[in-house]
Swiss-Prot record:
SUPFAM superfamilies in UniProt: LmbE-like (SSF102588)
Originating species: Arthroderma benhamiae (strain ATCC MYA-4681 / CBS 112371)
A biological process term (GO) from this entry: GPI anchor biosynthetic process
Membrane topology: Single-pass type II membrane protein
Domain of life: Eukaryota
Known pathway: Glycolipid biosynthesis; glycosylphosphatidylinositol-anchor biosynthesis
Protein name per Swiss-Prot or TrEMBL: N-acetylglucosaminyl-phosphatidylinositol de-N-acetylase
One of the record's GO cellular component terms: endoplasmic reticulum membrane
Length: 335
């Protein structure tokens, strides 16, 4: 009797998991997908610190926002070429694995990781390799687990890339302008508390403050969304974190003002709005993206097949049960 019950449980579990996962997904084919805000007809930049950040942390976001029917143009800006590697050595005396950090191009991975990022980006829906920009400036942006990047350097780079006329605007009364509408990056905890990740958050906020300096009467042309960091336990429960993130989003939407409710409806394109005299609804306070099984496999393949140099043993666990391979919830930052 017990063996029959165990067999039945093992047989039902995969089916139950598939049904649960399908219902939790937020894509257009999901039964619940249309109930969550998204972005349409936007110029979007994902700001990351290292090649593979886009696959290990932001795959659900990229796979969702690059859907052709949404009309978004997504780019990736990576501030290092990933020339830091971790070397794990078994210490025969203690029996423990010791981790050494190799910096510079001692690991010979710099040019390889640039190519891997481009391949991964295409698997995650970007239109072209030219939409991936990689900064190779170790003096300002060293790939290091201990170095904090200057927020002025990050902000200055963003300004030169997306608001080159910023200096001229500072002395005029015209509305601030930028060549992107949406900036995505890590939050202040950086998911893993990596100092490079956390530096992007502070640099991105400094960039928006620079855009608005002396322009308080105008709306900011760039909306900043940051990826929510979670507890250690939630990081490794995969799709089972979806209900938690959904509940958090619903509560936030209920008390977050009208912006989220307005953004629930599909808005017409900017050009159509201008012709009709329609004011574009404000961006949602929170965004939630939950991969379908197919999209999870796409993100999994982006990491496994594109970032081959990074597939050491402990990353297999992350891409298999890690919640960031399935669930992304992003919060709009008020600057």
């Amino acid at each position: 009797m017990n063996s029959a019950f165990t067999f039945l449980s093992l047989a039902i579990f995969p089916l139950a998991l598939f049904i649960f996962w399908t219902l939790s997904a937020t894509g257009p084919s999901s039964p619940l997908g249309r109930g969550f805000p998204t972005l349409t007809n936007k110029r979007i930049c994902l700001l990351i610190a290292h090649p593979d950040d886009e696959a290990m942390f932001f795959a659900p976001t990229l796979l969702a926002l690059t859907k052709p029917e949404l009309g978004n143009h997504v780019k990736i800006l990576c501030l290092s070429s990933g020339m830091c590697a971790l070397l794990m050595v078994l210490d025969s005396a203690s029996g423990w694995f010791l981790i050494y950090q190799i910096t510079g191009d001692a690991a010979g991975l710099g040019h390889i990781r640039k190519q891997e990022l481009q391949k991964s980006a295409l698997r995650l829906g970007l239109r072209n390799e030219s939409d991936v920009f990689i900064v190779d400036d170790p003096s300002r942006f060293p790939d290091s687990m201990t170095a904090t990047w200057s927020e002025e350097n990050v902000s200055g780079l963003l300004a030169s890339a997306f608001a080159p006329q910023l200096a001229a605007q500072a002395s005029s009364q015209s509305a601030p302008m930028a060549t992107i509408d949406i900036l995505l990056t890590f939050d202040q905890s950086g998911v893993s508390y990596h100092p490079n990740h956390r530096s992007l958050y502070h640099g991105a906020r400094a960039f928006l403050k620079a855009l608005m300096r002396g322009n308080s009467g105008h709306p900011c042309p760039v909306t900043l969304y940051t990826l929510t960091s979670t507890t250690l336990a939630r990081k490794y429960i995969g799709v089972f974190d979806a209900p938690i993130a959904m509940l958090s989003g619903v509560i936030s939407n209920a008390f977050g003002g009208s912006g989220d409710r307005d953004a629930l409806s599909t808005s017409p394109s900017k050009k159509t709005q201008e012709l009709r005299g329609i004011r574009e609804p404000p961006p949602a306070n929170r965004l939630l993206f939950v991969n379908s099984v197919d999209d999870w496999l796409s993100g999994w393949k982006a990491m496994v097949y594109a970032h081959k140099s990074q597939m050491v043993w402990f990353r297999w666990g992350w891409i298999t049960v890690g919640r960031y391979m399935v669930v992304n919830d992003l919060k709009k930052e008020l600057v």
